[in-house]
Amino acid sequence: MTLTRRRTLQLLAAAAPTLALRNTFAQTPPLTITPGPYTNIRAALHSYTTPDWFADAKFGIWAHWGPQSAIGAGDWYARLMYIEGTEQYDYHRKRFGPQSKVGYKDLIHLYTADRWDPEHLMDLYQRAGAKYFFSMGVHHDGYDLWNSRYQPRWNAVASGPRKDVVGIWAAAARARGLRFGVSEHLSNSFDWLAPSHLADTKGPYANIPYDGQDPAFADLYHDYTGMPANFAHTAQDMGRIAPGWWKLHYFNRVKDLIDQHQPDLLYTDGGIEFGSYGLGTVAELYNTGPYSYQNKSEAIFFSKTPNDCGPGTCVLDHERTVLNEIAPLPWQTDTCIGNWHYKLGITYKSPKKVVDMLVDIVSKNGNLLLNIPLPASGEPDAEELRILEAITQWTRINGEAIYSTRPWKIHGEGPSTKVVIHTDPTRFDPNEDRQPDLTAQDIRFTTKGKTLYAFAMGWPAQQTSKPAELVIQSLATNSPQAPGKPIDIRLLGRYDEPLRFTQDTTGLRITLPATPTPASNLGIALRINFA
């Protein structure tokens, strides 16, 4: 394409916001953190301790929702649509046309939220037992879901649904007493969007640039001026290679999210990145977030890097994986019922799988953050609603054994405790959705005060005409874990019926009622008190 003088002036005008951004940051003091006890020096964060409210909460729900969800083709669409040979590339070509003519920016209008009812959804989430809720703040695609000061064109108020999605979610959550969190996935956006700066390598559109190369859209796809000539070809999806001006932009943008919406929790998709800039986001959260009567920060920052989170500093998050044993400090698993972004035709996790994960994680001192992705409209599909209803029915009966509990001496017994689980918090567990469902032989424990709760992850099989019997070997008279002699055992959901039991060297044998409790196929919980 021949550049005329008029076209050159048009491109320079379009690029002006990004050029101004770079020049502004070049003249700006490195960081401006709200004054408080925390700074962007790592040692200053070591006084942080995880607040009790998080250890009590146990279960949160996340709406991983934005323009990429609106397309209905699953995860990482804004990147993979530009990579030849991927499912998303082929999908895009068939549905929208060649990437050199229709780019990601041209799809943002599909994110309509035209059937989004946040008040109703938050009622559903609260009834399902969630004690905290997460909104997407910004994903790797660089599209902000609030009225962003540092992304004025590509945000949910200026385009797409034309609503402050984060602010509306926050108001709905807080009105119901739920703690409110936001997620930011921005730290790797600079190189994650590199494929948008490429072109087809073959076919009728070979060598025709994708829209990431157009300076008019550098505020979305990033300005690679000054980067190595082959940067777009070599950049890795999680490389987090970015110039200094962009790292400061990252800090200011996340700070803007924090300052506008005062979240109780901030999830970062990775670790504390970019040295003092990442540490500055943690300090900003803790200095501006909620405080207890003891003047301790009650905010939570999540990192997936173990070295970030001890001593103090933050809570360790495990994406799509869990721990094998009890951890000394509270932690979190974040996972989803399907893809992170909404995908048509996908098979979701069953309610049984969700409850299995929740109970297992809580028994090990963890919390479960469960993503239920929303489509373009903002209205869950019928299967998502069915899953929510099943979880609701189960937590109504068994929530006493989940919330405000702490781990026991051991997390459980049974066949599943002998399975070694992949536990690297920086990597997905490829077998997360392939693990067999837990059964009545799989026992998990929690405690609250002097009360022990024992979960059996199913209703025990009934032998002939005899009532079903549950045997807990860890509570045998000669077990090193046994607290003593039980004096009262109740099945949650049947509080008025003390259960018959015997205890010997083979275990605690509990006779269950003739009729199972509702949702017992997902798991049951027993309240056990000792002399």
Segments from the language model and where they lie:
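Secretory targeting signals
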Residues: 1-3
